């Protein structure tokens, strides 16, 4: 009953809220919203051509990094990929167990990714938002819905939980490092996903909300 009340029912509520938000965003802005104009303009400022015609989402220009921002966002986007995130979570489960010898703490990284992923997959399937149109996109997109951003959600969820673990176990400089993990790294990943044409801005906002919520649930249940 505790799991049902503390995790399952709130998770269903989160899925419903995300789906409603996604439908509203699509209804109000369509599948080529005004927010994408900002992304196109920003990409153009760094020398990446964009095509205003619907469906022309992948530029024919070379995908090698040319600007500093390209060289920075490429590894960030790669770091937040699905296999990398799963491996990252598994590694931190092991590291936490070795350092803390606390089962609840050790499963926290896996638990937060499981919760975030379940909510992401369900809400994305319900929303079905297409990826941005007419943008520079150096890597092929995933087949899942653009809303919410799963990479962003996972980044905020996992790194938020890592920050909570540092604070719970009294690590040195936990406050400073915790802020970097909780806000800095995930925000940089969210930016990279938008800049590289993988998501609408609103996708990453929703992903950040999902990730923060997932971390809060795990903190309350496993890291009180």
Name these PLM-found stretches.
Residues 135-224:
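Membrane-embedded catalytic cores of phosphoryl/pyrophosphoryl-handling enzymes
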Residues 94-118:
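Interfacial segments of alpha-helical transmembrane regions
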């Amino acid at each position: 009953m505790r799991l049902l009340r503390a995790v399952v029912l709130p998770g269903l509520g989160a899925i419903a809220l995300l789906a409603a938000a996604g439908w509203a965003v699509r209804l109000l802005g369509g599948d080529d919203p005004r927010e994408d104009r900002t992304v196109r303009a920003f990409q153009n400022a760094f020398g990446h051509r964009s095509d205003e015609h619907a469906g022309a989402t992948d530029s024919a220009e070379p995908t090698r990094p040319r600007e500093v921002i390209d060289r920075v966002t490429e590894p960030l986007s790669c770091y937040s990929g699905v296999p990398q995130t799963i491996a990252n979570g598994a590694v931190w489960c092991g590291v936490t167990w070795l350092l803390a010898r606390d089962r609840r703490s050790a499963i926290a990284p896996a638990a937060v990714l499981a919760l975030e992923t379940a909510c992401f997959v369900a809400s994305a399937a319900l929303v079905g938002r297409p990826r941005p149109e007419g943008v520079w996109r150096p890597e092929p997109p995933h087949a899942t819905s653009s809303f919410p951003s799963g990479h962003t959600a996972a980044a905020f969820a996992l790194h938020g939980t890592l920050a909570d673990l540092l604070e719970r176990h009294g690590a040195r400089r936990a406050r400073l490092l915790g802020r970097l993990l909780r806000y800095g790294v995930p925000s940089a990943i969210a930016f990279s996903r938008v800049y590289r044409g993988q998501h609408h801005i609103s996708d990453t906002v929703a992903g950040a909300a999902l990730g923060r919520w997932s971390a809060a649930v795990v903190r309350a249940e496993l890291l009180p």
